[in-house]
Amino acid sequence: MVATFNPAVGSHVWVEDPDEAWLDGEVVEINGDQIKVLCASGKQVVVKDSNIYPKDVEAPASGVEDMTRLAYLHEPGVLQNLQSRYDINEIYTYTGSILIAVNPFRRLPHLYSSHMMTQYKGASLGELSPHPFAVADAAYRQMVNEGVSQSILVSGESGAGKTESTKLLMRYLAFMGGRGAATEGRTVEQKVLESNPVLEAFGNAKTVKNNNSSRFGKFVEIQFDQSGRISGAAIRTYLLERSRVCQVSDPERNYHCFYMLCAAPEEDAKKFKLGDPKIYHYLNQSKCIQLDAMNDAEEYHATKKAMDVVGISSEEQDAIFRVVASILHLGNIEFAKGTEIDSSIPRDEKSWFHLKTAAELLMCNEKSLEDSLCKRIMATRDETITKTLDPEAALLSRDALAKVMYSRLFDWLVEKINTSIGQDPDSKYLIGVLDIYGFESFKTNSFEQFCINLTNEKLQQHFNQHVFKMEQEEYKKEEINWSYIEFVDNQDILDLIEKKPGGIIALLDEACMFPRSTHETFAQKLYQTYKNHKRFTKPKLARSDFTICHYAGDVTYQTELFLDKNKDYVIAEHQALLNASTCSFVANLFPPVSDDSKQSKFSSIGTRFKQQLVSLLEILNTTEPHYIRCIKPNNLLKPGIFENQNVLQQLRCGGVMEAIRISCAGYPTRKHFDEFLNRFGIIAPQVLDKNSNEPAACKKLLDKAGLEGYQIGKSKVFLRAGQMADLDTRRTEILGRSASIIQRKVRSYLAQKTFIQLRISATQIQAVCRGYLARSIYEGMRREAAALKIQRDLRKFLARKAYTELFSATILIQAGMRGMVSRKELCLRRQTKAATIIQTRCRVYLARLHYRKLKKAAITTQCAWRGKVARKELKNLKMAARETGALQEAKNKLEKQVEELTWRLQLEKRMRTDLEEAKKQENAKYESSLEEIQNKFKETEALLIKEREAAKTVSEVLPIIKEVPVVDQELMEKLTNENEKLKGMVSSLEIKIDETAKELHETARISQDRLKQALAAESKVAKLKTAMQRLEEKISDMETEKQIMLQQTILNTPVKSVAGHPPTATIKNLENGHRTNLENQFNEVEVNGNAGKSAAERQLENVDTLIDCVKENIGFSNGKPIAAFTIYKCLLHWKCFESEKTSAFDRLIEMIGSAIENEDDNGHLAYWLTNTSALLFLLQKSLKPAGAGATASKKPPITTSLFGRMALSFRSSPNLAAAAEAAALAVIRPVEAKYPALLFKQQLAAYVEKIFGMIRDNLKKELSALISMCIQAPRISKGGIQRSARSLGKDSPAIHWQSIIDGLNSLLAILKDNYVPLVLIQKIHTQTFSFVNVQLFNSLLLRKECCTFSNGEFVKSGLAELELWCGQVNEYAGPSWDELKHIRQAVGFLVIHQKYRVSYDDIVHDLCPILSVQQLYRICTLYWDDCYNTRSVSQEVISSMRALMTEESNDADSNSFLLDDNSSIPFSIDEISNSMHEKDFASVKPAKELLENPEFVFLH
């Protein structure tokens, strides 16, 4: 495969091994052409130098995505690369444009999600990781761009995954060419996809190698129109394995449909008279009845569902399953010898039962069915002869009938599917997907294997020609000189098989036409004809077998059944029987045979199949082919097992190794200039000159190495076979010499370093010793000086201490004397002050005691009166409460009671305040009168004392003065009378004071009772409020539920108008409790028919005027949108919110929808985003569902009660008047909204979300192109020849990152200029950064060349720029930076050094805590260090990740390593409401254009 190379000792090579195919090892000894190799397994082998191949030690551990990039393109290199990728679940690998798919035998749903299809859409082949989607996309793009039909050929042996790969291709083509929007009925692509389950049910079966093996070939033509949309399709099938219906080997199964029908629901099983599949002969020949991974009952329902999709009616489905059931019953008919010679009849009652059941299911005559199985009619010229069949012949007849019925049924299904799908006669382009059997070689190979291998021979020839063509195109593209490349042509094998006359098929047809021919005579004919043919041999000791040397190996065929299987005819009795069936479906399967066809020449399966192959190849030759080779890694059908020998054989059978051999025949090694110089620049470093370009440098290097025959292309170096190994050998020798030099230098450096350290150590020890001696002398001197200083300081301390004690004692004595004098003086002053205070407090106490008595009496009187009035009102309220009727009246009266009780409480509080004031005034009067009485009492008392003293004096003087004049006696009497009067007045005052005290006590008691009653009334008021609130909540819930039920039908169409609403609405009632003078004038007009029409027309004109004004950009006022504010004021004034029918909302919605038709104008969209969000905020604050806020929105009822009248006086107080004035100035008014208003609010919310999404998507679209340029660092070659390019490379990426920041700044400026709410700006940036995170992260995981150290540093520098921008606009960016967490952690992992020392816990908990195991595994396996050539994480870490992935393999979500872009709306209406305030709109001015219009006077 490659030329012999000259290995050196230490070279790494591959040696052949009978068990493992190839083993890697190291050359340890060379003796001429004998090479001793130490294998990695530990054993030593001696081989010839011609039997070893070089190994690329620098190949990445995870393999390469395209094997043409391998340094050595040979069998062991290819095998090792596939195994390395298979071990890390990378099951797809390119070989040029050929995709190799290794069956993982496990579910990998993350590889086939819709998100993955989106990733591959439009990506160039090789740009992303290998995938069937990439092949399908390349075919689709080539068809659309070049106008050339395409074909995708999927091949491989049974169990390799051909069917699944075909499904993926068809799914992706349906994704690319689908119609998108739903159409009536099923689309073409849906029918094409759903045809797979139907064909699998009737054409797939379990074989030894595969549980779901396709036993037929399939070519699906998907037709496209000029725009690239699927317009039609056709399915062509080849060579159904009919013999499987009657003969099943253990442990295989028959076709799936038989087992599905047996597992059908009980009613279907009874209808078809079916039971356990083990009782049917056609099924119980094998012990395998049930498959572990397949539920036949579920598959039955899935198949019926697929039949519905592809257009098979329920009647046709019933007929199909009746035919299938009849075949099972036919198989259980056994025959015994009849009464006549060589005749037969059904053996027993069981056979008769199955015969009868089969006849019933086929709707034919039971006797006719028996005759068709047991008899033959021979027609001669004169008469018709009936011939009986013996039991053995009857069994063969039975099996022939079963096989032909199933074959016709399968053909009908294919034809029905094609008819249902429909072909486009005008289609010019198609993409064909070929799913056909791979090369087969078993112990027993019959006619089916012969036809299958013929197919593979034809396809292999087509494949070789395509590969050769690709090689030529590659050479032409690189403009190199090339000569004709020889490759193995299998035309001689094809001539051997299909040449006419003289080919094997022609001889087989000839043998079939002779009645007496047997397989032995046919074999002898083959032996005679091809005894000298190099591709044909006769096995030893074989009488009827023959061997053909195919391209993939020798295959021995057994001819026993060749003749029977090649005959393509239907027994006449079977044809007549089924054509006469009363079931139209069965009769149509066997239409009457025309006379022309009866007289036509012999037709065979082989010839017909050969014609089908010719037709297929004609189609393929008119298309551009693409190849997918499916590989089965092991025969155990288990994951994680890679059998080298098995895979190698399949690579050979699939033609992959032949393609590699063709590549090796020319220039097998192709390296880009930079890769070549980076790898081999060490051979001739002097050629890496600053002034040299890459091609010249490569040429100089190759000339320096003395190689010849190479070619320098436009972008690559093309090397002959073996030249890469020679270069690697020289490189290894140079590296070895360099290693020796490095080792010598290192040893010299280490010895020198040791000597220097010893010398430094000796010097340091000497310095330490000298220092120690010097420090000892210095320490003695310090101690002597210190002793002298201590003595001096001690003497000074003792003297100072004696003086300080004497000084302190003197001061202490003086302080004690002065303190004693001061304390005596302080004590005297305290006594004087205390006496004064006691006198003052005593006088105050006496005065206060008298005042409290008077105040208590006054309060008692007031409380008694208030209690009387309150009880009277409470009694009236109770009577009114007992008279309540309906729920609404109860609610209104409760509201009235609550208000009255509220006002009563307020009045009570006010009365308490007034009474307090009256108390104070009365107390003041009482105090003043009391003082007067006390003064009079004191004066009277003083007079009495004087009188008593005068009387005493008189009594003392009386004995002396005997004679008193008359005048003195009269004066005495007057004084006595006056004294008596004063005494009486004093006693009456004392009585009056006692009565007043009693009344005060009684009043206090009554006041306490009244207070209790007032508290009880207040508690009752609270309870009534609670009850009323509950009633309101119930009513509100009922109304809200009603509104929600009405609105559910329009939730998904917020932009459309409400059906059923007329364009105009009749104004029934314009009163809402807040009428202006202008409204009063309008409502006073008599509403008759003509006046109503005029008002409606005026309303429509006003709405038109409003829309004409606000549909233009009328700007902002104080940072708030004028249009939104104007619309809200107009709708509020026109009472549209309270109207049951209005067209204003529909007109506004239409206006907004037409205003945002230009989806690319971010400025215009931002303007309307601000307006719609502001208007939504105003509606959110204003609108209340009907009945939910009736109490708050209604005007307080006018009351004539005492408390109501008194409350009116309270409303006119200064504080309440100011509050009313502030409420009048409020912009937002609560309104009880009707259904149209609530619908308008929902539609407005939908438009806010829609405009937000449009702006966000525009930004994403702008950034998408830039992100793709920011993910991969520019490649920089080794040496100076790229220095100028490096300097440009540093600036070029920065331009793309700066362009992203410029795009963000541009949009931010637009949003700020249009005053978009801050919360929406933050959400836009948050979702945009999340999009950037998803795109960068997914690109990193899908492109191996991105998972490098240098690329990590490159992306990290770009992320730093974004972080700086987020810091600069932190207010508007919000938490956007946190959205980049995945790419930040992934890049952080790429740029850390010494990854092999990092443990799994360190990665999961410290480096990348947010990443899943699948994502970490993907990064670790793809990573390669392009700067320092260090290793990735250790194998233990990889094993830990793989174990965890195996545990989570059943979870589809956990298996996905890609991120999904979240396009949902990330905010709610409440967030918008919380970001604004009502006061922000207080200073907003309406549109100036409307202020001049007399109809909009209310805007002033």
Curated annotation (Swiss-Prot):
Residue ranges of every copy of the Dilute domain listed in the record: 1146-1447
GO CC terms: cytoplasm; myosin complex
Any Pfam family matching the protein: DIL
SMART domains found in the cross-reference section: DIL, IQ, MYSc
GO molecular function, one term: cytoskeletal motor activity
Family statement drawn from the similarity comment of this UniProt entry: Belongs to the TRAFAC class myosin-kinesin ATPase superfamily. Myosin family. Plant myosin class XI subfamily.
Coiled-coil ranges per UniProt: 884-1049
Localization terms from the record: Cytoplasm
Lineage: Eukaryota, Viridiplantae, Streptophyta, Embryophyta, Tracheophyta
Matching PANTHER family: MYOSIN, MYOSIN-8
Residues covered by the Myosin N-terminal SH3-like domain: 8-57
SUPFAM superfamilies from the UniProt entry: P-loop containing nucleoside triphosphate hydrolases (SSF52540)
Complex formation: Homodimer.
Keyword Nucleotide-binding carried by entry: yes
Residues where ATP binds: 156-163, 210-218
Domain notes: IQ domain mediates interaction with calmodulin.
Intrachain disulfide bonds: none
Keyword Nucleotide-binding: yes
Chief localization: cytoplasm
Stated name of the protein: Myosin-8
Keywords noted in UniProt: Actin-binding, ATP-binding, Calmodulin-binding, Coiled coil, Cytoplasm, Motor protein, Myosin, Nucleotide-binding, Repeat
Domain IQ, first and last residues per copy: 735-764, 758-787, 783-812, 806-835, 831-860, 854-883
InterPro entries: Dilute_dom (IPR002710), IQ_motif_EF-hand-BS (IPR000048), Kinesin_motor_dom_sf (IPR036961), Myosin_head_motor_dom-like (IPR001609), Myosin_N (IPR004009), Myosin_S1_N (IPR008989), MyosinXI_CBD (IPR037975), MYSc_Myo11 (IPR036018)
The Myosin motor domain, residue ranges: 62-732
Domain of life: Eukaryota
One annotated GO biological process: root hair elongation
